[in-house]
């Protein structure tokens, strides 16, 4: 048994609900992987929480006329409600606006400061006179100046261009403007603290040389190194955030009115959220744990460059991320998700309309894993969603399980001894490799292929004619039920509620399917007959519910 620390990129609690792209990129991917590892028999802690500090929270709180704390309390509960509905099974779900977060951030900063990796700079920064505030990178927009984007007049945030994925120097943005009031900012000098990434480059390179990132994740990380790492500002002129430890050095007293940049201390939240849950968090993390992080591709450089540089430079004995499970972007009907523009489906809406449609979270989980943007951007399409539910969930998986148990109901066989065949051992092996490599689409594809094989087996053996003629069908039914049992076990990480509900009707002497790769027998007792597990979705009705017409 191994230990796995699975974390999903911490979502901002500055909106009422995450959209489906947020869910599939980090949280659902983390949940599927954590469940898979638990099914293998490993010890797993799956952790996430809300990333509560920063400009986005301040702006949202200002709009709603509440304090930042009140806003975070409100949206923490709303987000957790959505994640619970989608059956995302966290072992720990916390938040970053805690005393532990401050303590651990200070510990890391103090190490960096004492080791000479923090420098001071007086910089000229964009200041919006209308909003009376310095503009954080995410609230300063303009045209990206990098090749390819400059010619196409791509509008970028001030931290990183979403199109070319390159870092942005805010002073080089073309025609910058405040994203809040849309007016051009003035330039105003201010003092800030910088993380000396240039000095930390060799240590980051050593880290990247030893971790097991796949080629896509490594390419994103190495691209930053090839451009060259420069000192990065880690403080902001804000009120809401982790304060600077000004008592460390009298020189730091002038930073009393500043806080740490959210991307400096947000990943530290993985430590602090766990620390708030268990006192032995350091001991557990340093006990040979494999750390797997799930996230969208735009978060990768902060987790593979900035975060490890900070921890390594502090010289504190804390583990770092071993593997990153990254995705591209999920679009909605070909467009980028946007609540303000009414584009996309959001978690709270999905939870609202699903009971009206007579479906549960597994329908959405299934389709989202089917289209998971693993190697390129993909798009959620309502017509395709309805079609996939019909062809894959109802006609393939559902039909196979229903046929087997409808036939079994007509026989006296309730205690079966199943010898797994070499063909299905290979299915399990291929599935295990795919899931371990974060190829969840391939894992689901293997399940669908297995179900199709099962359907063909039933069709070719025609047990219904033998039952009608009073002939012995125990061998056929044992094989068919055994295939169902394997299939449902492999589907547990993807559609856990449906798979576990069906498996509860089967009592076995072995709950770990991956132990059967050696070819062991398994005894299966039928407790209840499984009924038709899935239903079709009416597209017209689905659209009406989404549009609020019903």
UniProtKB/Swiss-Prot annotation:
It catalyses: tRNA(Met) + L-methionine + ATP = L-methionyl-tRNA(Met) + AMP + diphosphate. Belongs to the class-I aminoacyl-tRNA synthetase family. ATP binds at residue 339. The gene is MARS. It comes from the Viruses. One of its GO terms (biological process) is methionyl-tRNA aminoacylation. GO terms for molecular function: ATP binding; methionine-tRNA ligase activity; RNA binding. A motif ('HIGH' region) lies at residues 10-22. The keyword Nucleotide-binding applies. PANTHER family: METHIONINE--TRNA LIGASE, METHIONINE--TRNA LIGASE, CYTOPLASMIC. It is an enzyme of class 6 (ligase). The lineage of its organism: Viruses, Varidnaviria, Bamfordvirae, Nucleocytoviricota, Megaviricetes. GO terms for cellular component: aminoacyl-tRNA synthetase multienzyme complex. This is Methionine--tRNA ligase. NCBIfam families: metG. Its EC number is 6.1.1.10. It comes from Acanthamoeba polyphaga mimivirus. Keywords: Aminoacyl-tRNA synthetase, ATP-binding, Ligase, Nucleotide-binding, Protein biosynthesis, RNA-binding. A motif ('KMSKS' region) lies at residues 336-340. Pfam families: Anticodon_3, tRNA-synt_1g. InterPro entries: Anticodon_Met, Met-tRNA_ligase_1, Met-tRNA_synth, Methionyl/Leucyl_tRNA_Synth, MetRS_core, MetRS_Zn, Rossmann-like_a/b/a_fold, tRNAsynth_Ia_anticodon-bd.
């Amino acid at each position: 048994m191994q230990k796995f620390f699975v974390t999903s990129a911490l979502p901002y609690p500055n909106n009422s609900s995450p959209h489906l792209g947020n869910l599939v990129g980090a949280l659902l991917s983390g949940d599927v992987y954590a469940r898979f590892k638990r099914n293998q028999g490993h010890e797993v802690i799956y952790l996430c929480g809300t990333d509560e500090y920063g400009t986005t929270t301040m702006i949202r709180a200002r709009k709603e006329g509440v304090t930042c704390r009140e806003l975070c309390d409100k949206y923490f509960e709303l987000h957790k409600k959505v994640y619970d509905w989608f059956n995302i099974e966290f072992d720990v779900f916390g938040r970053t606006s805690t005393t532990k977060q401050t303590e651990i951030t200070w510990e890391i900063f103090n190490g960096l400061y004492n080791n000479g990796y923090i420098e001071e700079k007086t910089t000229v920064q964009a200041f919006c006179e209308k909003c009376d505030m310095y503009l954080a990178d995410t609230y300063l927009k303009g045209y990206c100046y990098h090749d390819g984007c400059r010619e196409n007049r791509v509008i970028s945030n001030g931290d990183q261009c979403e199109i070319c994925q390159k870092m942005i120097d805010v002073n080089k943005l073309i025609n910058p403007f405040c994203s809040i009031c849309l007016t051009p900012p003035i330039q105003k000098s201010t003092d800030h603290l910088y993380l000396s990434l240039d000095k930390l480059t060799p240590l980051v390179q050593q880290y990247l040389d030893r971790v097991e990132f796949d080629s896509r994740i490594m390419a994103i990380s190495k691209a930053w190194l090839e451009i060259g790492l420069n000192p990065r500002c880690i403080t902001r002129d804000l009120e809401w955030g982790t304060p600077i430890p000004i008592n460390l050095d009298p020189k730091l007293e002038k930073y009393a009115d500043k806080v740490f940049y959210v991307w400096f201390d947000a990943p530290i939240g993985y430590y602090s959220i766990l620390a708030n849950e268990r006192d032995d968090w350091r001991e557990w993390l340093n006990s040979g744990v494999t750390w797997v992080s799930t996230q969208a591709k735009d978060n990768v450089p902060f987790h593979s460059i900035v975060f490890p540089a900070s921890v390594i430079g502090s010289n504190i004995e804390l583990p770092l991320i071993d593997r990153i499970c990254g995705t591209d972007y999920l679009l909605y009907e070909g467009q980028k998700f946007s609540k303000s523009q009414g584009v996309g489906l959001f978690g709270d809406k999905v939870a609202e309309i699903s009971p009206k449609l007579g479906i549960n979270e597994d329908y959405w989980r299934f389709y989202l894993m089917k289209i998971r943007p693993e190697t390129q951007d993909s798009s959620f399409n309502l017509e395709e969603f309805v079609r996939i539910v019909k062809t894959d969930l109802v006609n393939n998986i559902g039909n196979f399980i229903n046929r087997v148990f409808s036939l079994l109901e007509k026989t006296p066989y309730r205690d079966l001894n199943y010898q797994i065949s070499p063909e299905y051992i290979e299915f399990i092996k291929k599935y295990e490799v795919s899931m371990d490599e974060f190829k969840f689409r391939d894992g689901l594809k293997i399940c669908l292929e297995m179900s199709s094989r099962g359907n063909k087996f039933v069709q070719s053996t025609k047990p219904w004619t033998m039952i009608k003629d009073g002939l012995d069908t125990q061998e056929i039914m044992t094989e068919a039920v055994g295939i169902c049992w394997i299939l449902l076990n492999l589907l547990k990480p993807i559609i856990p509620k449906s798979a576990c509900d069906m498996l509860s009707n089967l009592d076995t002497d072995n709950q770990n399917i991956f132990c059967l790769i050696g070819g062991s027998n398994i005894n299966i007792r039928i407790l209840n007959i499984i009924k038709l597990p899935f239903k079709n979705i009416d597209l017209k009705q689905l659209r009406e519910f989404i549009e609020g017409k019903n």
